């Protein structure tokens, strides 16, 4: 129902906006919550969804996500392969503007073409820069909030709760990678205008096309994120 959808959405947004915890933990919590809600939905146990929502608000849920991430931490090689694969999925979408394809190819080259160790180095350097110089973590959080808000509306009607939340997480990941690529291109600089420009270009390609939104959702159903990997 629409009321249930609003409750789930509100609770997820509450978790995402709680800055006492790292964004990584918050993402793990909303993926975990969506994963368990999906299970209840599939088994037609919607009456127990309240309990799922409450469980993911607790300290033990945060502890659980932290522990899972420690145990399931992908290797440098796996992380590079996973990131590259997720980025390449953007080529499966309908191309609306030529300059978008150019941006994707250039970004892919900058990020992934030098192998796993180079990608790890780039990611660590960017993270360090972002911490010191920029409010990119807050921008990423706001993007997630926006995407959950936008994508989640129909989730309870079509039963694709996990796919919709995964889509919000992957969309934010894609934009984060585009920021990272531009930062490399600029030799360690990224202006607020460029941050906004890349969000705009992504939205223009993906969100302004129903066909692309539908394709992306199908990809989410095909390539499910093991939620604890974040």
Where are these regions (language model features)?
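Glycine/tryptophan-enriched, flexible segments
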Residues: 11-12
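Hydrophobic, aromatic-lined core segments that form the binding pocket/scaffold
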Residues: 17-230
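Short, small-residue-biased leader/transition segments that mark boundaries at the very start
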Residues: 3-8
